């Protein structure tokens, strides 16, 4: 899966040269090898690991274009390296490999089934274990060990209603498959019910819907998305986008 959207969480070894500041005080380190050609070139030029935090305000919709990054962080960063729209749309799948069994910390651009198949072909027959969602509203003492574990995350300013098949007069409906989009933009994640296309469009369309409803009191409705394959990751993002704000 490397280069590609897979992050592995490993135990930090004694003498590890990576700065402690990048591990948020944890004794683990997360490693990924991006496939984007511009990111690959940057790594070659730097010739060292790069600490890469999320390029958006915490808790808000993830960026999938340079314009999204500029909209969220303008005035706070010196440079944006524009490699074009994200091909996968979703963030990486995060697997914790620091213990006795692999743990799925965040579903993402590589589906659970594909990873389990790869593990089985390597002689690892255990299924991926899910990590619990963390709810900061209830004073949950558990510290997040990966991005996107809080109940509310990836959230637009507008409220979000899931599994909608029709839209009210005050909603912007993003469709999928047989459920057509409605509202000012009338968008669909995928008119052909293609989950990969839906993943690619997910955050870009959430950004568009949030922009068109801003200051109007209108909200966002989302058509049902199957939980198969990469649909698990899409629904993970949508549930967190729709959750009460922490």
Question: How should each PLM-predicted stretch be described?
Answer:
Residues 1-246:
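Active-site-adjacent structural elements in enzyme catalytic cores
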């Amino acid at each position: 899966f490397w280069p590609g959207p897979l992050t592995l969480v490993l135990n930090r070894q004694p003498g590890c040269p990576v700065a402690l500041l990048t591990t948020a005080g944890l004794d683990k380190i997360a490693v990924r090898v991006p496939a984007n050609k511009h990111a690959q070139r940057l790594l070659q030029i730097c010739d060292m690991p790069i600490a890469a935090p999320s390029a958006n305000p915490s808790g808000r919709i993830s960026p999938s274009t340079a314009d999204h990054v500029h909209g969220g962080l303008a005035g706070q960063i010196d440079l944006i390296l524009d490699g074009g729209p994200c091909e996968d749309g979703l963030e990486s799948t995060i697997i914790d490999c620091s213990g006795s069994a692999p743990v799925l910390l965040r579903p993402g651009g590589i589906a659970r089934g594909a990873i389990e198949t790869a593990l089985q072909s390597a002689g690892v027959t255990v299924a991926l274990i899910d990590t619990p969602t963390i709810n900061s509203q209830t004073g949950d003492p558990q510290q997040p060990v990966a991005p996107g574990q809080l109940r509310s995350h990836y959230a637009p300013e507008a409220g979000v209603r899931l599994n909608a098949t029709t839209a009210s007069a005050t909603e912007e409906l993003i469709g999928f498959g047989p459920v057509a989009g409605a509202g000012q933009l009338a968008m669909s994640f995928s008119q052909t019910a293609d989950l990969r296309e839906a993943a690619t469009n997910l955050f870009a369309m959430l950004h568009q819907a949030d922009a068109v409803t801003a200051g109007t009191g209108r909200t966002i409705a989302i058509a049902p998305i199957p939980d198969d394959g990469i649909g698990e990751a899409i629904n993970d993002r949508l549930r967190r986008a729709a959750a009460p704000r922490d």
